[in-house]
């Protein structure tokens, strides 16, 4: 609806569409960090392979359905050149690097050219999947060897990412939009909340 640019009296009816992705990243950080922290508190460890398996079982079926539908529609409406680019985006999406592919392909999200790419919206899933790969490993190392400073280290990485995003917002705008380093602070905002709630044993009834 946001990208349709509906207007009423020269006022966009659905403004601020991109903020939905930002909120999605924060919620993702909160939920995944909560799951990992609870597992560590219960077992004094995190089964990383089991975590990866659960993520694959949760995400891949829906991803394959989207790719299948996109493939059918693409063969109907796209010309050979665009179809070649679509095929490349399929492999990038399956390899969890859709955001990287679309960044270096050089398109601006929401433009007319970009709208001819059926899988473009999977860029955010690429960021999410990269976060899934990195977080359990980093969190396990921090909790095992730097537990006293875990909250501080998390806040430090959050600050570094936010600072980089601020710098890149004027110097490297496209990188800032597509890539994990400048998106990590959004995910880590949710992680920080999860750390706080679990550390101080705050239940949902107390919030």
Give each language-model segment a name.
Residues 1-207:
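Membrane-interface helix/loop caps of multi-pass membrane proteins
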């Amino acid at each position: 609806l946001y990208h349709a640019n509906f207007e009423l009296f020269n006022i966009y009816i659905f403004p601020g569409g991109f903020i939905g992705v930002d909120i999605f990243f924060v919620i993702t950080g909160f939920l995944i960090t909560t799951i990992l922290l609870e597992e560590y508190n219960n077992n004094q460890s995190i089964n990383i392979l089991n975590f990866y398996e659960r993520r694959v079982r949760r995400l891949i079926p829906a991803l394959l359905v989207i790719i299948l539908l996109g493939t059918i529609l693409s063969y109907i409406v796209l010309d050979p050149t665009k179809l070649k680019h679509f095929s490349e985006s399929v492999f990038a999406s399956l390899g969890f690097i859709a955001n990287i592919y679309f960044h270096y392909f050089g398109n601006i999200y929401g433009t007319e050219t970009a709208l001819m790419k059926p899988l473009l919206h999977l860029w955010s899933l690429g960021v999410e999947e990269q976060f899934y790969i990195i977080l359990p490993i980093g969190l396990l190392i921090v909790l095992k060897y730097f537990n006293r400073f875990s909250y501080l280290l998390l806040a430090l990485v959050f600050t570094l990412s936010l600072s980089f995003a601020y710098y890149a917002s004027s110097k490297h705008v496209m990188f800032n939009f597509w890539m994990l380093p400048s998106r990590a602070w959004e995910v880590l905002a949710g992680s920080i909340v999860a750390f706080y709630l679990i550390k101080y044993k705050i239940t949902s009834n107390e919030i």
